[in-house]
Structure formats: structure tokens, C-alpha cells
């Protein structure tokens, strides 16, 4: 469960809310005066929050939990607050906000900073840093990190234990690399990035040419001469891999969010603020537009162009361009196995049934 602040560090609700990043948010309290405001030590779900925690309601399916939650305060939409007032419901201080999920996110950021301090700057004695590497002020380099020739680490960046920063690579200011992140040579990460453990950026793209001089069916390697460029405010999940370009660079735009275990092949371009869920595979030279969302385990073929504002449902196989914004789904619905077998048998006969139907129409 989330870590609670020590009792002596608990904050009055209005003081806590005044201390968060309120950009783009407008909120007010339902409590009549400051004397009624609880002191807050943490944040939790409606079902798990205690009487010293704040919670939130952003999904209507959990609205019935408002009646049973022990939370000291709950973030709700204006409609929910009005409905509770009309019903005469009481018992909780309400934080009324048009965007409760975003306000919850800002509170979670505050509690993370309060409960998980970054630790002091400095280079661990076991780290190996090439003399030509540049490390700006307030950088923290963890145990057994390797920073190769010509690499640069920007101000305030933090490298967890065992990270490898290849020759000529750059890590932007205030970025966080969790333990065992690997940046090959020529990988450039922007500011305020978060890269989770096991991620590998800049490995060779999958490039081979048929070469009969090496033997029947043999393949000759095509050196991958491009780089990887990651924008600002990007998050990359654990064990995600982003290959370097063959000639042009592989590019991840500003604000992109990549979940765990995603494969981004060489020369792919991902537009700003696109979010991609776990286990997605993106084949080489595909371009994905801005503000797209791609559901988990989807597969995108190579050399495709995906428009801006496209939403791809989980498990979809995309094999052709998508030129228009909207939601796209290519998933065969699950069913009981016996029913699925019957439906699959019918699908296998569709071409035959189509021919027979056309023959009947001609009669």
C-alpha cells in the first residue's frame, strides 16, 4: 500500500492542495470552513483509503463506494458533488474538480516527492566514467554505472546502479534512468525523461541482405548507422527496446509514453504525446502520428503511416496505412472454446459460401 507520511508531517487538506502543481486545474472544497478540514498523510483508492488519506472518484462504476469509503476527503466532479448535495449525503469533505483524475495525478506526484527523496548528487566510487564524458552539476551516478567517451549527462539527471551510457550519447536535464538501463552509442534522451529498468535504446535494427556469397539462403548484416532520438518528458517502460535507425534516426517525440516490453524497430517515428501499452510491436520505418493511443499486444507492420489522433484497440494487427483519425479494432472476440471452434469453422468457409451465394444470385 502507499507509504503514509509520518503523523507529524501530515498536512491540512487546504495546505496540501495549495502545495501541488495546479496548472490547468480549478478546484474548490465543499467544507464550510477551515476548521472542518482533515489532516492528510497519504492517498488511496476509495476501497482502501483510511481516515487520514485522500481519495478520488473518476470512474462512475465506483460511485457506490462513496457511501462506504473511510477516506477523509474525496476528489469528485461537480456533477457528483451536486448529486450528493441534492441527496443530503454527508460525511466526507469533497474536493470538487472538473478533472479528478488529473488532480489525483498531481497529488500522487507530490506524495512521491515527499516519501521518496532523490538522494544526494555525486558519482559513486565504483562507477566508470571516461575522462572525456561531461557530467553537469547535481547529477547522481549510481554504483557500477559506465559512462563512455564523449557522453554527456545533463544537470540534475539521476542514473541508477548499473546503467550504461554509450559513447557520444546524451541524457537531458532532470531525467531519471532506473537501474540497468542501457543506451548504446549515439542515443540522445531529452529532458525530464523516465526510463525504467532493463530498457535498451540503440541496439542494431533488424537489417540483413540476402548474400549468396555466404552460402545458400545466407544473410549479410547491414550495419545500422542511424541513431535514436528521444524527446522531452518521455517515459519508457521496463524491458522496452528501441532500435537505432539504419540510415535515418529512430525518433520518439515529446511527451510519448511507452509501457513495458514494447519493441520499436529501426527508423520508426512516434509522434508527440502518443501512448502505447505493453507488448506492442512496431515494425521498421512505420510512422505513428501525434496523440495516438495503441492498446496492449497490438502489432503494426512495417513502412506504414498512422494519422494523428488514432486509437487502436488492444490486440489489433495493423497491416495497412490509417489515414483518418478515429478508433480502429481488429480483434476477434473471445468466446467459450466450443463456440469459438464452430465460428472458426464457418470463417474458413466464407470464400466458398460467397461463391455459392453469387451463383444463386445469377440464377
Swiss-Prot record:
PROSITE patterns according to UniProt: HEXAPEP_TRANSFERASES (PS00101)
One GO cellular component term noted in the UniProt record for this chain: membrane
Record key words, sorted: Acyltransferase, Lipid A biosynthesis, Lipid biosynthesis, Lipid metabolism, Repeat, Transferase
Catalytic activity line of the entry: a UDP-3-O-[(3R)-3-hydroxyacyl]-alpha-D-glucosamine + a (3R)-hydroxyacyl-[ACP] = a UDP-2-N,3-O-bis[(3R)-3-hydroxyacyl]-alpha-D-glucosamine + holo-[ACP] + H(+)
InterPro entries named among the record's database cross-references: Hexapep (IPR001451), Hexapep_transf_CS (IPR018357), LpxD (IPR007691), Trimer_LpxA-like_sf (IPR011004), UDP_GlcNAc_AcTrfase_non-rep (IPR020573)
Leading EC class: transferase
Active site: 266 (proton acceptor)
GO molecular function: N-acyltransferase activity
EC number per UniProt: 2.3.1.191
BP-aspect Gene Ontology terms: lipid A biosynthetic process
Pfam families: Hexapep, Hexapep_2, LpxD
Recorded metabolic or biological pathway in which this protein acts: Bacterial outer membrane biogenesis; LPS lipid A biosynthesis
Subunit comment: Homotrimer.
HAMAP family in the record: LpxD
Membership in a protein family: Belongs to the transferase hexapeptide repeat family. LpxD subfamily.
PANTHER family the record matches: UDP-3-O-ACYLGLUCOSAMINE N-ACYLTRANSFERASE, UDP-3-O-ACYLGLUCOSAMINE N-ACYLTRANSFERASE 1, MITOCHONDRIAL-RELATED
Role of this protein: Catalyzes the N-acylation of UDP-3-O-acylglucosamine using 3-hydroxyacyl-ACP as the acyl donor. Is involved in the biosynthesis of lipid A, a phosphorylated glycolipid that anchors the lipopolysaccharide to the outer membrane of the cell.
Name of the protein in question: UDP-3-O-acylglucosamine N-acyltransferase
Source organism of this protein record: Bordetella pertussis (strain Tohama I / ATCC BAA-589 / NCTC 13251)
Amino acid at each position: 500500500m502507499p507509504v503514509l507520511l509520518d503523523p507529524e508531517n501530515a498536512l491540512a487538506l487546504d495546505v496540501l492542495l495549495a502545495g501541488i502543481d495546479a496548472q490547468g486545474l480549478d478546484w474548490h472544497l465543499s467544507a464550510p470552513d477551515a476548521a472542518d478540514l482533515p489532516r492528510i498523510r497519504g492517498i488511496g483508492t476509495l476501497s482502501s483509503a483510511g481516515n487520514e488519506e485522500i481519495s478520488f472518484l473518476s470512474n462512475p462504476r465506483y460511485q457506490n463506494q462513496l457511501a462506504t469509503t473511510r477516506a477523509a476527503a474525496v476528489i469528485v466532479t461537480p456533477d457528483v458533488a451536486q448529486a450528493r448535495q441534492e441527496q443530503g449525503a454527508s460525511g466526507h469533505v469533497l474536493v470538487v474538480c472538473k478533472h479528478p483524475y488529473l488532480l489525483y495525478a498531481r497529488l500522487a506526484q507530490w506524495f512521491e516527492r515527499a516519501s521518496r527523496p532523490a538522494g544526494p548528487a555525486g558519482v559513486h566510487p565504483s562507477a566508470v566514467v571516461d575522462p572525456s564524458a561531461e557530467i553537469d552539476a547535481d547529477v547522481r551516478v549510481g554504483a557500477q554505472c559506465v559512462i563512455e567517451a564523449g557522453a554527456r549527462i545533463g544537470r540534475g539527471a539521476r542514473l541508477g546502479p548499473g546503467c550504461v551510457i554509450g559513447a557520444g550519447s546524451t541524457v537531458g536535464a532532470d531525467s531519471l534512468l532506473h537501474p540497468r538501463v542501457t543506451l548504446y552509442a549515439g542515443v540522445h534522451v531529452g529532458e525530464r525523461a523516465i526510463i525504467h529498468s532493463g530498457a535498451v535504446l540503440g541496439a542494431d535494427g533488424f537489417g540483413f541482405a540476402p548474400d549468396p556469397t555466404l552460402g545458400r539462403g545466407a544473410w549479410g548484416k547491414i550495419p545500422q548507422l542511424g541513431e535514436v532520438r528521444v524527446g522531452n518528458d518521455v517515459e519508457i517502460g521496463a524491458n522496452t527496446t528501441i532500435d537505432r535507425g539504419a540510415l535515418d534516426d529512430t525518433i520518439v517525440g515529446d511527451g510519448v509514453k511507452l509501457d513495458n516490453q514494447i519493441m520499436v524497430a529501426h527508423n520508426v517515428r512516434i509522434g508527440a504525446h502518443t501512448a502505447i501499452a505493453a507488448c506492442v510491436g512496431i515494425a521498421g520505418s512505420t510512422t505513428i502520428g501525434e496523440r495516438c493511443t495503441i492498446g496492449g499486444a497490438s502489432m503494426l507492420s512495417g513502412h506504414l503511416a498512422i494519422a494523428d489522433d488514432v486509437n487502436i484497440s488492444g490486440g489489433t494487427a495493423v497491416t495497412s496505412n490509417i489515414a483518418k483519425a478515429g478508433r480502429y479494432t481488429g480483434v476477434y472476440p473471445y468466446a467459450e472454446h466450443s463456440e469459438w471452434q464452430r465460428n472458426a469453422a464457418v470463417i474458413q468457409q466464407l470464400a466458398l459460401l460467397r461463391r455459392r451465394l453469387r451463383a444463386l444470385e445469377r440464377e
